[in-house]
A protein has these predicted regions:
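Conserved N-terminal phosphate-binding loop of PLP-dependent enzymes in the Aspartate aminotransferase
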Residues: 1-431
Length: 431
């Protein structure tokens, strides 16, 4: 069946034809690519078209598709069993590896998704502080739990629905929204609710409104404010965890949070999430403490074995991070040269192996700047890239993910496609 035929059939049985909104390609006015198989840096769809893949499952596939370490781990796990509803040695090994890799955390609890991780972390922070309000930032996305789907990024920004219908006002009222990279907005918020704020949660590198890093002064200021007011500082590292560095953002950015949320890379492509923190905070979690959180498939042996295999490989092969940086820098420099050659002033942001080409001339610091992007132009660009066999995010507000499997040949083909696509996009406007 063709992608179009599959999508038409999917729309009969699945809301919008997809199980996560961005996959519908709606924001680029396209038909979804229905994936059939992946190999290394390449993905093949149901029509037999092959693409150089920069979606990479939205982040988990840091080693690329079908890496032998991942394949072998899946085979090994299936021989033992996929779910027991009991603790396993794998959970212990996984938790130990995560804790030892991340500065400032003593314990970690496994869950099934990034959404579960952030939702649970906030519950624990509220229980620990005995406070109810939280601060988040415009354009930061922390999953689809009610209290966090307020002025959010990712699909909420892509589809211009930053605050979803279906969330009661009494829940929204507990979420205070501040401006990313603007410490004064946080100071004003704390001054208004000095004894009510349990936690500040943020993406230390925002990756769900495109790549927008928090500046150093902003992060250090948040750390200081949280210390002064006994507020729990939570880093959402679902995307950045184990990607920007094996030791994640504390090593890369130099600020240590009180709690952290993981997902994506720690599962090696299987559904997984985790949240961790200092021992005094994590001891609030049941059965050690009174804050309840549970899950039938939390810490399931299949995800644990595969995640453990990927993290162990990364730990033992730190050259992966050198290759990722080299590849990403090569791609960044190539795109900058193209923009200069074509006299285009679009904004290109890169943080390690995460990249976004913003179709705006406005310097990007936060949510308001991102909203100046020409999404119609991005849609044209996306289609031209796809036609040349390059699969990038079907949304202006999502990142490109570079994997260890991407080769120089892949990058050169990508740069050729970027040049051709930009030329065609701008020719179409002048016609």
């Amino acid at each position: 069946m063709s992608n179009r035929e599959l999508f038409n059939e999917a729309c009969q049985y699945i809301p919008g034809g997809v199980n996560s909104p961005v996959r519908a390609f709606k924001s680029v006015d396209g038909i979804p690519v229905f994936a059939k198989k992946g190999n290394g840096s390449h993905l093949t769809d149901e029509e037999g078209n092959e693409y150089i893949d920069y979606i990479c499952s939205w982040g988990p596939l840091i080693l690329g598709h079908g890496h032998p370490v991942i394949k072998n781990a899946i085979i090994e796990a299936s021989a033992f069993g996929t779910s027991f509803g009991l603790p396993t040695q794998l959970e212990v090994e996984m938790a130990k590896l995560v804790v030892e890799s991340y500065s400032g955390i003593d314990q970690v609890r496994m869950v099934n998704s990034g959404t579960e991780a952030t939702m649970s972390a906030l519950r624990v922070a509220r229980g620990y502080t005995n406070r109810s309000k939280i601060i988040k930032f415009e354009g930061n996305y922390h999953g689809h739990s009610d209290g966090l789907l307020v002025k959010a990024g990712s699909g909420a920004l892509t589809f211009n629905m930053p605050t979803s219908p279906g969330i009661p006002e009494e829940i929204i009222s507990q979420t205070l929204v501040c401006t990313y990279n603007d410490l004064s907005s946080v100071e004003k918020c704390i001054a208004e609710y000095p004894k009510d704020i349990a936690a500040i949660i943020l993406e230390p590198i925002a990756a769900n409104m495109g790549i927008v890093p928090a500046n150093a002064e902003f992060l250090k200021g948040l750390r200081k404010l949280c210390d002064q007011h006994q507020i729990v500082l939570i880093f959402d590292e679902v995307i950045t965890g184990f990607r920007v560095s094996y030791h994640s953002c504390p090593e890369y950015l130099g600020v240590i949070p009180d709690m952290v949320c993981f997902g994506k890379i720690i599962g090696g492509g299987l559904p997984v999430g985790a949240y961790g923190g200092r021992k005094d905070i994590m001891e609030m979690v049941s059965p050690s403490g009174p804050v309840y959180q549970a899950g039938t498939l939390s810490g399931n042996p299949l995800a644990m074995r595969v995640g453990l295999a990927q993290l162990t490989y990364l730990k033992e092969h730190m050259e992966v991070y050198e290759h990722l940086e080299s590849s990403a820098q090569y791609l960044e420099n190539g795109i900058l040269k193209i923009l200069n050659k074509l006299s285009l002033s679009y904004q290109l942001h890169r943080q390690k192996s995460l990249l976004t080409l913003f179709f705006t001339t406005q310097p990007i610091q936060g949510y308001a700047d991102v909203q100046t992007c020409d999404t119609a132009m991005y849609a044209l660009f996306f289609k031209e890239m796809l036609a040349q066999g390059i699969l990038i995010a079907p949304s202006q507000f999502e990142a490109w993910f570079i994997s260890d499997a991407h080769t120089k040949e892949d990058l050169d083909k990508t740069l050729d496609a970027v040049y051709n696509a930009l030329v065609k996009c701008h020719d179409s406007l002048s016609d």
